[in-house]
């Protein structure tokens, strides 16, 4: 997320974190690879004035999920949600673009980057097809275990001083539960490599066993340092709240949460 798009309170927290070596907002992909076009049809781009600034995940036909710090302090009427994108520098016929009707948050604390999740209601309903689909979410409390292989993704920069790619990037990561507060964040590392998420467009999904288990939130110690884990908001801790928002606003999940054994609730 560009500094000019942050609220003064969030910006102050980020600068202090950088100075002290603490958490800083994420997340660009460092050390990843280009994703196959539309391999992740639930991936969304949050944009202002035609420019991408954060990722998001389609969780119902008229709702996306993202990081709270992405929209903290923003006039939501300036935000557009783009579905079905792959190459942001091309005019793609696969895209569906929506304005924001309403934003729901759940006690976001910008100073500690806690509860870094928002649900964004679109001004219309997405057309579900091969390029635009609803993500699978975990059931409440059914988080991801230690050493689970996952996939992070985003359109952010390839490094702190490198430009952003035009096409969606993906990165294999591994969950490390002993390096963060389990019910507060999902943390990941890339074993034996300097790779990970970085400053820029947060809000993108962490996919583990075909479920979106995390929302890109913050980093410590620099981009892809290999020393500190990257942190994601834990979707499983908010699953009941997410479902209540969707159900109370006259839409429904197209695919229902599943438990660890794959059973539909």
UniProtKB/Swiss-Prot annotation:
Disulfide links within the chain: 54-70, 150-208, 180-187, 198-223
Gene3D superfamilies given for it?
Trypsin-like serine proteases
Q: Where is the active site?
A: 69 (charge relay system), 116 (charge relay system), 202 (charge relay system)
What are the annotated glycosylation sites? Answer: 123, 172
Enzyme Commission no? 3.4.21.37
Q: Which residues form the signal peptide?
A: 1-26
Query: What family classification does the UniProt entry report for this protein?
Result: Belongs to the peptidase S1 family. Elastase subfamily.
GO terms, molecular function = cytokine binding; heparin binding; peptidase activity; protease binding; serine-type endopeptidase activity; transcription corepressor activity
- What's the top EC group for this one? hydrolase
**Where on the tree of life does the source sit, at the highest rank?**
Eukaryota
General function of this protein: Serine protease that modifies the functions of natural killer cells, monocytes and granulocytes. Inhibits C5a-dependent neutrophil enzyme release and chemotaxis. Promotes blood coagulation. Through the activation of the platelet fibrinogen receptor integrin alpha-IIb/beta-3, potentiates platelet aggregation induced by a threshold concentration of cathepsin G (CTSG). Cleaves and thus inactivates tissue factor pathway inhibitor (TFPI). Capable of killing E.coli; probably digests outer membrane protein A (ompA) in E.coli.
Provide a GO biological process annotation: leukocyte migration involved in inflammatory response
SUPFAM superfamilies (alphabetical): Trypsin-like serine proteases
Protein name according to UniProt = Neutrophil elastase
Q: Taking every annotated instance into account, which residue ranges of this chain make up the domain Peptidase S1?
A: 29-247
GO CC, sorted alphabetically, is:
cell surface; collagen-containing extracellular matrix; cytoplasm; extracellular space; Golgi apparatus; secretory granule; transcription repressor complex
Subunit record text = Interacts with NOTCH2NL.
Q: What reaction gets catalysed by this protein?
A: Hydrolysis of proteins, including elastin. Preferential cleavage: Val-|-Xaa > Ala-|-Xaa
Q: Which Pfam families match?
A: Trypsin
Q: Which organism is it from?
A: Mus musculus
Alphabetic keyword roster = Disulfide bond, Glycoprotein, Hydrolase, Protease, Serine protease, Signal
The knockout note for this entry states:
Knockout mice are more easily killed by wild-type E.coli, but the knockout has no visible killing effect on E.coli deleted for outer membrane protein A (ompA). Reduced fibrin formation in response to FeCl(3)-induced vessel injury.
């Amino acid at each position: 997320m560009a500094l000019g798009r942050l609220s003064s309170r969030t910006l102050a927290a980020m600068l202090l974190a950088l100075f002290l070596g603490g958490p800083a907002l994420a997340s660009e992909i460092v050390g990843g690879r280009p994703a196959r076009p539309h391999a992740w049809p639930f991936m969304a781009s949050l944009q202002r004035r035609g420019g991408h600034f954060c990722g998001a995940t389609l969780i119902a036909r008229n709702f996306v999920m993202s990081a709270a710090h992405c929209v903290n302090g923003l006039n939501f009427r300036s935000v557009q949600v783009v579905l079905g994108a792959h190459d942001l520098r091309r005019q793609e016929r696969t895209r569906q673009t929506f304005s924001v009707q309403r934003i729901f948050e759940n006690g976001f604390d910008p100073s500690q980057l806690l509860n870094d999740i928002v649900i964004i209601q679109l001004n219309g309903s997405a057309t579900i097809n091969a390029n635009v689909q609803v993500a699978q979410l975990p059931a409440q409390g059914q988080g991801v275990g230690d050493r689970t292989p996952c996939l992070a993704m985003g359109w952010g920069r390839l490094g702190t001083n490198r430009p952003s790619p035009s096409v969606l990037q993906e990165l294999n990561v591994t969950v490390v539960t002993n390096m963060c507060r389990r019910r507060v964040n999902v943390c990941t590392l890339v074993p034996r490599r300097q790779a990970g998420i970085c400053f820029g467009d947060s809000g993108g999904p962490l996919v583990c066993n075909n479920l979106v288990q995390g929302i890109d939130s913050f980093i410590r110690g620099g981009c892809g340092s290999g020393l500190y884990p990257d942190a994601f908001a834990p979707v499983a801790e908010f699953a009941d709240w997410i479902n209540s928002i969707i159900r109370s606003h006259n839409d429904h999940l197209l695919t229902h949460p599943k438990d660890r054994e794959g059973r539909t609730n």
